[in-house]
Amino acid sequence: MTLAFQLAVFALIATSSILLIGVPVVFASPDGWSSNKNVLFSGTSLWIGLVFLVGILNSLIS
């Protein structure tokens, strides 16, 4: 169970880092929002899901 929690936290940190860099780049590019809207929504949905997963796993571990 601890390994699953650690992997979920790592995935959350990695996704956060990717979104931290990717979102401003998409908004700064001329046609970025129109062409990458679905990718950003998917990344944001993944991030929200990982936040809930980490919370659930944390409550099971402690």
UniProtKB/Swiss-Prot annotation:
Keyword Iron-sulfur among record annotations: no
Keywords, alphabetical: Chloroplast, Membrane, Photosynthesis, Photosystem II, Plastid, Reaction center, Thylakoid, Transmembrane, Transmembrane helix
Cell compartments where the protein resides: Plastid, Chloroplast thylakoid membrane
Primary location recorded for the protein, binned into one broad class: plastid
Gene Ontology CC, one term: chloroplast thylakoid membrane
Pfam families, A to Z: Ycf9
Topology term for the membrane: Multi-pass membrane protein
Family note: Belongs to the PsbZ family.
NCBIfam families hit by this protein: PS_II_psbZ
Quaternary state and interactors: PSII is composed of 1 copy each of membrane proteins PsbA, PsbB, PsbC, PsbD, PsbE, PsbF, PsbH, PsbI, PsbJ, PsbK, PsbL, PsbM, PsbT, PsbY, PsbZ, Psb30/Ycf12, at least 3 peripheral proteins of the oxygen-evolving complex and a large number of cofactors. It forms dimeric complexes.
Protein name, per record: Photosystem II reaction center protein Z
Species per Swiss-Prot/TrEMBL record: Daucus carota (Wild carrot)
Lineage start: Eukaryota, Viridiplantae, Streptophyta, Embryophyta, Tracheophyta
